[in-house]
């Protein structure tokens, strides 16, 4: 952005997380036993409750959790959002640090935001609808994250649930 050339977008830019958020939705659904990894859900190209579709409108047929995550299937994760509910999504997003600063030792870090009925009521004075839960389940709606928050969330998954606070080192004393 030529009007803000010195903004550190890694810590201060806030963007919809999109499909990586499906990891949080899936974690919530599995942990709350709203789905098993083996359960098959049929994707006809749109959800059966609300006309919410896959990005390209494609129908992917029968999918279990692993295949849905690998294909980044919106319809499957709309259903996980439906089963978990917005309260569950908000809770699990908080476990992964969504809507909170990472604590990096840099000035200007943004906290992002997790979509919720309370946020919508506060900002827009409007009711929450199921379609917004579906959007939140796939990382859209009012959810905003910094690139660093997404990196921390994904590293937590890669590290088996161990979350490390990021920091900028001033020096490295030795290679060990």
Q: Where are the regions that the model predicts?
A:
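Beta-lactam-recognizing serine transpeptidase/beta-lactamase-like catalytic domain environment
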Residues: 1-19, 24-176
